[in-house]
Amino acid sequence: MKRVNKKIIGVLVLLVSIGSFYLLKQVQKHGKTSQQETKQKYIDAKTEKPTIHVFDDNKFVFVAQKDGIGGIAFGQDYISVLDVHQKEINQSMIDREKNGSPKIAKDEYFNIISYDLNASGFPSKKTEVYQLLGKKEYRGAYDISQYYADNKDYIPVTLYKVGNNDSRKIIVDITNQKIENLENFEDNGKSTFSAAEQELSKGNVYNNIRQAMKEKYHLKFTAGYIDTLLSKEDREKIDISNTNFAQDYPEMAKDIKDLARLYMRPKQYSTKEWFDTVLHWFAPKGQDVLEVYATDPKTGEKTQIKSYDELQVWSANHTD
């Protein structure tokens, strides 16, 4: 009987030991998890060099981006992307008040990589925004766009202050790699091509060509550039194999599903040339123009428009 009791006690001691060991491991594991959760997250935003073509007397630029959408700024002299390694910005008001924002670590950086459209092979140069700012008091937001003025390309950057995350905006001169006063750019953000959209809107032609490009090719037309619709399904459906563009530029046509943007450079831009060129590029192979129509707002009568000049004549004869 005593021998049996000893066995039972031994088993109980063993079970308690195993349970204690398992509980200790769970506590240690939980402690590690908690430490990891409180550790500040890093954000890495890096866009690899896209495929670039500058063509037709250097007036047009075709940019393709493999396996991705966005993160590219399109300019006159440069195509720019971000290369960022920094701690996560608490952008919500609750997170700002609760957690603030930690000091910038030595390994953090916010760089703009720009590819020169005027040089063979499109070599890159790096603009180190933290270095331009001098004091490491701000982190940059991870979005990028480009702005062209005074024959130079600029990148607007939104910054968040270390500590309270108050925001401010700067504008970076890519050509000279320096920060400019944002107040000198009051029209920053306005489209270079907004006036052109108004020109092409007469007779609903602008919407008509947008609809034709979407339905036929799953591409998005705007005044000054063409890019893809956002959904992956639309990108997979893109097919321009039977167009004049594919016949004239087969090397670019094969990358069309990865299109980031096809655009006319701002300095060379003219609404007439852009409109006439797109009508020819995206016409069925061998035809002169893509079919688009102007609609009389009073009668509903449709008239095919084959050129910018024809649209001007139609507009003059259909004044309100």
Regions found by a protein language model. Give the residues of each.
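Short, solvent-exposed, Trp/other aromatic-anchored flexible loops in extracytoplasmic proteins
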Residues: 136-149
